[in-house]
Amino acid sequence: MKLIEHYVALVKTGCAEYGQMNEMTLTEIADCLFCTERNAKLILHKLENSNWIIRESGAGRGRKSKIAFLRRPEELLLQTAKEYTMSGKLKKAKELLQQYQSAFPGLQNEYNMWLSEVFGFVTETGENGAKDVLRLFITPESVSSLDPCQIFLRSEGHFVKQIFDTLFTFDSDMQEPKPHLVHGWEEVGKKQWRFFLRKGVLFHNGQPLTSRDVAFTFQRFLELADNPYKWLLHGVKQVLEKGPYCVELILDKPNALLPYALCDERLSILPAEQGGGKNGTGPFQMNQQHSGMLVLEANERYFKGRPYLDRVEFVFSEQAGEMNGFTIQEKQTCPEQQTVFDERHVQYLSLNLKKKGPLQHRSFRKALRLLISSERLVREAGGHRRIPVTSFLHPSPFEWEGVSPSELLKKSGYEGETIVLYTFSETDHREDAEWIQNICAQHGIRLTLQFCDAADLRRPEIVQMADIIHDSATFYQDSEFGFLHLLLSENSFLYQHLSEKLTQICSGMTERMFSMPDRCSRINILRDIDRQMIQELNAIPLYQNVLQVTSSKNVKGLVLDEEGWIDLYSVWLSK
């Protein structure tokens, strides 16, 4: 039993009135706490040290001690639940409140009211005046790495964007790069690019951004042995500083996509002085990161203008997925409004054609495609699942000729071998995987599920153990680069699962793309790759999500970034 539980038990047994002396023998106390008299003395000592009781020991064996109970149990239970919550122990807080729900019926409501006041969008007043704070729960693995070229999860990309900046950003309306840390650039021939940096941009530690930092960042990016994104600097062989505010890239082959690549957060600019680190030029700077919390503070000197938020606190909790991270309220009670965002994240299955087994037979893969109906999955699983898809890029659905799955399974020679599907442990992944498992079982396919954390799914040996991996791909703003990441990033599940034939096709066709200045021509090549991949059944696209954001009407500037997270830079609270 925990100290709070000991206290509640003693109050129930021996408290006639709070603050007044109540008589109990040590034997009665030990019986109440289900422990020895020796342990009862230790517990009483701890309660005294916590200032929860005052005790006067009785003289002689069997004499009654006098105990004054100073705190009401419901106050302490609520305080303990709050402490658990702020340290990310949501499950413990929930279990504690449920344990005493019948004894203290109003406790859960008080906790819920407190939770709505301190989480979400709140205004807090302290020594330095009023501060607008956004406080959310996230899982600890959401920020396993804040090194831009080690990003694996969308959440990591989101945090990197808050702390760092890139030379360009992608204009989703114009579908082209626009200057960010640069104010201009020029292409000299087809193998030489010059970029001209803005003056007056400062890192969070006050040091100015110069060409040295850009050169350091790109050189580090090219030289890191375990960087899975080297294709982003395709053809770059030399990075030169041409004065304090000019950087020149020398290529050994044309790369028409270079300005687009320089929008990617994996090429965020790091300070040369510190050899990297978490000191960026972005709109927020890291105040602290430890096992319980990540805190971002507004960058007062941000070159694009200070964020409206003063501070953002992310409380780590393994149960964060059970909380609605997109419910943003303010402390004052306001009518709610609901904003729905379509999300260009495509949920899909990557089929491992490098592994021996039933998936090597195209008839078996085709049977799976027919059984795992995107329309049926969206209809039956519901929730955030919105638009069934049959490809990554093609607007029109792929049609399959009318062969029954049972005939295809028979043709493939399938004899009940076990197929293993790996995916993340979050609820939406579990729901999809269990739905797929049930469909397969109905048709005699033995499918087992392995739910993993991100750290395991980063490991190439785990990826190759899987027959199938369930994941989602980001296509929110730039569908061209979203698909290229699937095809070329070495930590992409699809990249690691592609058949030898498709690997060669992708390599040849994407190599041609880099020399094409016309975006429409490049998209057509990607659609051709998409078509061949779907026909070869190396991947099974499933559906697009819809994200729902609920907020009070006083929360303004709600925009989701391409990772599906709230754009922290633009959101604000109207008083």
UniProtKB/Swiss-Prot annotation:
The gene coding this protein: yhjP
UniProt entry keywords in alphabetical sequence: DNA-binding
Record keyword DNA-binding present: yes
Binding region for DNA: 26-49
Membrane spanning residue stretches: none
Residues in HTH marR-type domain copies: 1-120
Start and end residues of each stretch annotated as Solute-binding region: 176-490
Record lineage: Bacteria, Bacillati, Bacillota, Bacilli, Bacillales
Origin: domain of life: Bacteria
MF-aspect GO terms: DNA binding; peptide transmembrane transporter activity
Name under which the protein is recorded: Uncharacterized protein YhjP
Organism: Bacillus subtilis (strain 168)
UniProt entry tagged with the keyword tRNA-binding: no
GO biological process: peptide transport
